[in-house]
Amino acid sequence: MDVNPTLLFLKVPAQNAISTTFPYTGDPPYSHGTGTGYTMDTVNRTHQYSERGKWTINTETGAPQLNPIDGPLPEDNEPTGYAQTDCVLEAMAFLEKSHPGIFENSCLETMEVVQQTRVDKLTQGRQTFDWTLNRNQPAATALANTIEVFRLNGLTTSESGRLIDFLKDVMESMEKEEMEIVTHFQRKRRVRDNMTKKMVTQRTIGKKKQKLNRRGYLIRALTLNTMTKDAERGKLKRRAIATPGMQIRGFVYFVETLARSICEKLEQSGLPVGGNEKKAKLANVVRKMMTNSQDTELSFTITGDNTKWNENQNPRMFLAMITYITRNQPEWFRNVLSVAPIMFSNKMARLGKGYMFESKNMKLRTQIPAEMLSSIDLRYFNDSTRRKIEKIRPLLIEGAASLSPGMMMGMFNMLSTVLGVSILNLGQKEYTKTSYWWDGLQSSDDFALIVNAPNHEGIQAGVDRFYRTCKLLGINMSKKKSYINRTGTFEFTSFFYRYGFVANFSMELPSFGVSGINESADMSIGVTVIKNNMINNDLGPATAQMALQLFIKDYRYTYRCHRGDTQIQTRRSFEIKKLWDQTRSKAGLLVSDGGPNLYNIRNLHIPEVCLKWELMDKDYQGRLCNPLNPFVSHKEIESVNNAVVMPSHGPAKTMEYDAVATTHSWVPKRNRSILNTSQRGILEDEQMYQKCCNLFEKFFPSSSYRRPVGISSMVEAMVSRARIDARIDFESGRIKKEDFAEIMKICSTIEDLRRQK
């Protein structure tokens, strides 16, 4: 029977159908090729917004820098980055007046964090610009390379393991006249392929030492690498995002810790909370404005959009904010926090890979690296690219563009939120000193503004005043993209409010389905996603039941594990049928072994193994979960695992799911093809770290693992632990005297080897 799709909406209030207009089904668009063009756009736009600022030359790197701070006041509605220092400081002062002690308390909290944070905090995060190799690396590898190079240059403070000590090394490294680095190089040789008899290029990787003078090192330390942001839905054009290097990361972390601590205390801040907590915060602000607007008052809400938030923010302004926020704090603390904005106001944006060229008859392809853009003849480029390059040329130094104004995406989300909230805070009646007043919400660059006034003129005046106040702080509310409604209907960070929040279910669509980790994890994640959506997103029981059936079907097709009594033929069906026939209690078989599905919407919280345990044959139990079975992977499994699910907006979320180690929790092996590429050296480094960490964890199982205090190395810690454990085992009779003696001997040998080294 054909269903007329409009029937679906007959009983649905219009606002609930918002889901259907979102571009979230199907694959998101990915970028291909280089991000060089997008990065040049960002750099050129940022300078254009601040073009009436003052130009100076950086004495250390020779980079031309534009400073728009305290620039001309706006005469029109075009976006500009001319924030006024005194206005920002005054906004901060008012924020503190409204929240007595907020800065003081946040500073104390942050100081504690600064003293306790370990350097391994920097291993979190994905891609990081590795300044030693001049390209992106996984964060852990980039950090290790940095520390290795620091040690090579006699900077060893960071060996204490505290992040603050690593930052001391960073500061010291910038004072050095030259830095010696270990970098990779490629050798290319032309050799004849035995199979095809064609000539092929063979690459090998070596490590070499290289010296950087102070200027060269500073340029690298201040460089942000750029990439194209992938998987952005609902946009025609791609845009560039930045990955900072290890020198900047630690300083940014502490600034953001302070800002996060402030945001937590501000009722108008949409960060750092999320989900239902954020909705509750929002609903509170709306309630406050609705109840306070008595019958005599009108209340309107702007669903706000700011033009190019990041490109008009300015690190110098952030420096002023931090200077104010920390004004009564110890000198060392103020210094640590001011490094990040100072580094950002001297930053360089790496232009990425450069341009690919193809000759018309397609015989030749060549890549023009970014370093060559400053000297290459422009006649090879089309008009728009030519204009971009001409504009950016004066700013280029060694393939990176000097970019003093602007913030690059996602670097200071919390601190910029504090700036936004400080304007919302000025809307109280005691500050506006007139009949209109405002309040709202701010989450990074997204905002919702609620204005109350006795009449429409008052509303208009309130909005105008808000708009102008924003301009003074370098924030440009877009008049084209913001829209105003009677309070009760608005959108904020993709939450739709219509007398209460409307579930925007389409946003969760990308996380339904089979994740592709392994059979065990996928089953668990799949049912957890359905469970979470029943709790948070108005997924009704009937729809949830249907989602579950679709998921099981999808799962069976993905892993070719149709029920043992099915007629569907797959590569696995022969084995599965055999298992089915020899199993007495067929209900006990896992779905991934061809068993029936016992899930329904009431028992989604129970891992499948636990759900079916009582129903399993004894010998099946013995194979499935036996730690001695070589196919049961216990390496990666803790009682709660984290999966990365992709919601439609915002970063990938981690989601907890229960995991039970079985023969189905395998970990796939790494793709072999990487071993033949230039990454091979890096892969070997990574495996070495992996091995060291695994070994360390063997000695310190998670139950007894306390962060090592003091400055003993990993080896010393493991040796002393081995001695203690051996003694306990020997005294309790778990090991024989000979074993005990041998363990002690090995420990001594290791210590001797360390001393000789």
Curated annotation (Swiss-Prot):
The keyword Nucleotidyltransferase applies. One of its GO terms (cellular component) is host cell nucleus. Its EC number is 2.7.7.48. Keywords: Eukaryotic host gene expression shutoff by virus, Eukaryotic host transcription shutoff by virus, Host cytoplasm, Host gene expression shutoff by virus, Host nucleus, Host-virus interaction, Inhibition of host RNA polymerase II by virus, Nucleotide-binding, Nucleotidyltransferase, Phosphoprotein, RNA-directed RNA polymerase, Transferase, Viral RNA replication, Viral transcription. It is found in: Host nucleus; Host cytoplasm. Transmembrane segments: none annotated. It catalyses: RNA(n) + a ribonucleoside 5'-triphosphate = RNA(n+1) + diphosphate. Signal peptide: none annotated. GO terms for biological process: DNA-templated transcription; symbiont-mediated suppression of host gene expression; symbiont-mediated suppression of host mRNA transcription via inhibition of RNA polymerase II activity; viral RNA genome replication; viral transcription. One of its GO terms (molecular function) is RNA-directed RNA polymerase activity. Residues 249-256 are annotated as: Promoter-binding site. It is an enzyme of class 2 (transferase). Residues 286-483 form the RdRp catalytic domain. The keyword Transferase applies. Phosphorylated by host PRKCA. A motif (Nuclear localization signal) lies at residues 187-195, 203-216. Influenza RNA polymerase is composed of three subunits: PB1, PB2 and PA. Interacts (via N-terminus) with PA (via C-terminus). Interacts (via C-terminus) with PB2 (via N-terminus); this interaction is essential for transcription initiation. Interacts (via C-terminus) with human PKP2 (via N-terminus); the interaction competitively inhibits the interaction between the RNA polymerase subunits PB1 and PB2. RNA-dependent RNA polymerase which is responsible for replication and transcription of virus RNA segments. The transcription of viral mRNAs occurs by a unique mechanism called cap-snatching. 5' methylated caps of cellular mRNAs are cleaved after 10-13 nucleotides by PA. In turn, these short capped RNAs are used as primers by PB1 for transcription of viral mRNAs. During virus replication, PB1 initiates RNA synthesis and copy vRNA into complementary RNA (cRNA) which in turn serves as a template for the production of more vRNAs. HAMAP family: INFV_RDRP (MF_04065). Belongs to the influenza viruses polymerase PB1 family. This is RNA-directed RNA polymerase catalytic subunit.
